[in-house]
Amino acid sequence: MKILKKIITKDYYKILISIKKIKIAWDIGNGAMGAVIKEITNNLNNSENILINEEVDGNFPNHHPDPTVPKNMEQLIKSVKDNKCDIGLAFDGDGDRLGVVDNLGNLVWADQYMLLLCTEIANLYDIQK
C-alpha cells in the first residue's frame, strides 16, 4: 500500500470552487472552529454560508457540541430546512468530528459520508475499487 503525503488545502479549495453554487448551513457549536470558520467560508467563493453558534464559548450555551447526538443537531436541521440549504455541517468542540445534514434535514452518519468521500478520493487518484 502506497502512503500519500500531501498538503491538500489548495487542491481542496479548487475542487470546492469548481462545484456549482451551494448553500451551506454551518453549526460551529461555539467550539474552536469558530476561530477559523470565517477564513474557511471566505475561501468558498461559490457558496452562500449561514453560520450559527460561531462565537467561541467553552460554556456551549446553545447545545453540547457533539454532532453524533441527534438532539444536538436540531438547530442545524432547522437552519437547513428554513434556509433551503444544500447541506448542513456541524463540528464538535475541538473541530475533529463532523456532523452532516442533507438538504431535506436528514442526518447523514459518518459511515455514510465516509463512503462517499472514499469513492471520490478513489476516483481522483484512479485507485482500483
Located regions from the model:
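Proline/glycine-rich low-complexity loops and linkers
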Residues: M1-I8, L16-I17, L104-K129
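Gly/Ser/Thr-enriched, mixed-charge loops and adjacent short helices
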Residues: M1-N83
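Structural beta-strand/beta-sheet cores of well-ordered domains, especially the beta-sheet scaffolds
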Residues: I22, D96, Q128-K129
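General beta-strand structural signal in soluble alpha/beta enzymes
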Residues: W26, L51-N53, A90-F91, V108-A110
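Short acidic/polar active-site loop segments enriched in Thr and Asp
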Residues: S47, D86, Q128
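Solvent-exposed, flexible loop/coil residues
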Residues: V56, H64, D102-L104, Q112
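Short gly/pro/ser/thr-enriched loop/turn and capping motifs at secondary-structure boundaries
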Residues: V56-F60, R97, L115-C118
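Glycine-rich phosphate-binding loop
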Residues: V80-D102, L107
